[in-house]
Amino acid sequence: MANERTEPLQLNLGSLRSAMSLTLHTHHASRIWHGRAPTEGRPGIIGLNGFIGAMNKMKRGAEQDDPYSDWWMLRIEDKLADTKTRLQTLREQVDQALADVPAALSLGENMNVQPVKLPLFVNAQLGFMAVYLLADYDDLARKLILAHHTALIDRSTLERWLNDGAHALRSLFSLAQQYRYSGTTRDDFAAKNAAARAALEKFGELPQDVLEGTRRSRFAPPIARRTTKPGTPPAAPAIEPDAPAHTD
């Protein structure tokens, strides 16, 4: 018995999953979640669902060694930081307004008695960063509404600050809406083949350090060995802008 060989124990572990949801209290944040439908003379803008879908596809593109996906991740990361700064500036302004409340008066937080709870299916860190920004905007909107209700700011200030915050988020989502997977790899550019030439003509030149892979987003995924033919997008379901954002 002591000489019998034992087979190693096989552990077939699946992927880790966590149930997540986002609770929104204001119609202003809810509209950002859903996006803006196209109208005559004004293009539509994806909502948070569409942004998450774009980030998931962008991450998969970067995994496939698409240098354009890496470049887009860097651009979105910079835009996320800019959006966060803009919302923080608005928060400081409304906090200053609320600071004028007399010490004898106590103001509680204004919470919606029927908030909307939205499920989240996010597979990219840049997607999570946008979720945090929308949650910040929802909290900011609640404080602005409270400040107006208690005569600390007038209606024009309320509307201007709400619009400034919404514009910052929609500008972020509008940028992400332009992303397209190029179907090329860095090997294509090293070989200077037809796929690389077509991508250059369609998407333009890339910064050299991005093309070489020496500069990537801090949330860029490891590059996987390519198993699909050039020009074939990463195998994953597309996500419609206003459909629930599911991921693999």
Predicted feature residues:
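Short, solvent-exposed positions on alpha-helices
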Residues: S156-T157
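Polar/charged low-complexity regulatory segments
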Residues: M1-L133, D139, L146, A166-D248
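Short, hydrophobic/aromatic alpha-helical segments in well-folded domains
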Residues: K143-L144, W161
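Conserved hydrophobic residue
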Residues: L152-I153
